[in-house]
Regions:
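Conserved N-terminal helical subregion
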Residues: 1-86
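Short beta-strand or tight-loop elements
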Residues: 23, 35, 108-110, 193-196
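Short, glycine/charged-enriched secondary-structure capping and boundary segments
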Residues: 36-37, 66-70, 96, 148, ...
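Conserved mid-domain beta->alpha element of the FAD-binding
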Residues: 53-54, 81, 133, 168-172, ...
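Histidine-centered metal-chelating micro-motifs
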Residues: 60, 80, 111-113, 220-221
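Short, flexible hinge/linker loops that cap or flank conserved catalytic cores
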Residues: 46, 127, 206-209
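Conserved FAD/dinucleotide-binding core of flavoprotein oxidoreductases
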Residues: 4, 90-188
Length: 280
């Protein structure tokens, strides 16, 4: 059984004070002087800081301020359809084959995998857990906007969350699963009432720090999910940055951080592309 994202989130979120975790104030851009870094927010306000750590993911707004140039993530040519459902929602025959196994099926230009994860509150007891499936499928860049259009007709740049997928698109997904997948996996796809979708992107930063700015996690390296190292990579970045800041002046700490983590990010990103090239 694997741990789930929401379990990790709650564990770390509990360590942060309410006043230190601010929602609803999106950052538009980042800049800096010799004395401070500045955040320009979408609401027109500004915040000043000694150091800004951009842990803002695939669409990072901190990234261009670090690299000094436009630095978009590059679409890799395929998407991951995903489902996360109570194990009790699986038909009995499918559950007997899929639960407590890392199941995998490959076909031309596509593959699907699935595994059991903890329940919504970290439950590990049989019957209280969830089943997570991921179905990789090739989608042309020209079709991507249509696939990432939500129920309100808005086009999203990277993903659709649970509940955002139009029912008509879900029905097509279920029908495709019935035609293309083994019955246990097809049943798992059909059992998910709110599938979600993640487009797969690549990005490698040429640098992780600049002045009073640093990149961390997917803001620095967007790696393919096949590596199963996205969380571990970000955690490694965070621990390395913390270690440096705890013992060195910030400028020296950032240099040490980049020296340690940049080659690791390059290696993981390369490994992910190798795995993705085997799709199908």
């Amino acid at each position: 059984m694997q741990i789930s994202w929401d379990k990790l989130y709650r564990a770390f979120r509990a360590l942060v004070a309410e006043d230190d975790y601010v929602l609803g104030r999106a950052v538009r851009s980042v800049s800096q002087t010799e004395k401070a870094a500045r955040l320009d927010l979408e609401d027109g306000s500004q915040e000043m800081a000694d150091l800004v750590v951009g842990a803002d993911g695939v669409g990072s707004v901190v990234r261009p301020a670090v690299t000094g140039q436009p630095s978009p993530s590059i679409y890799a040519g395929y998407v991951a359809w995903r489902g996360l459902l109570p194990e009790s929602a699986l038909p009995v025959q499918s559950a007997a084959l899929l639960l407590d196994r890392f199941a995998f099926y490959t076909m031309p230009d596509s593959h699907i995998l699935g595994y059991t994860v903890t329940g919504p509150n970290g439950e590990t007891e049989t019957g209280a857990r969830r089943y997570n499936w991921v179905w990789y499928r090739r989608i042309s860049e020209g079709e991507l906007g249509k696939v990432l259009t939500d129920v309100q007709g808005h086009v999203h740049p990277y993903s659709l969350a649970p509940g955002q997928l139009p029912d008509s698109r879900r029905q097509v997904l279920v029908e495709d699963a019935a035609h293309l997948l083994p019955p246990p996996f097809a049943a798992a796809v059909a059992a998910e009432r709110q599938p979600f979708i993640q487009a797969i992107f690549d990005y490698e930063t040429p640098r992780m720090t600049h002045g009073r700015l640093a990149l961390l996690g997917d803001a620095a390296f967007v790696v393919r999910p096949h590596t199963a190292m996205g969380v571990a990579k970000a955690a490694g970045d965070a621990m390395a940055l913390r270690s440096g800041l705890a013992r060195l002046p910030y400028a020296d700490a950032l240099q040490a951080y980049e020296r340690e983590r940049l080659p690791i990010g390059v290696e993981i990103a390369s490994y992910g592309r190798q795995l993705g090239a085997r799709l199908g």
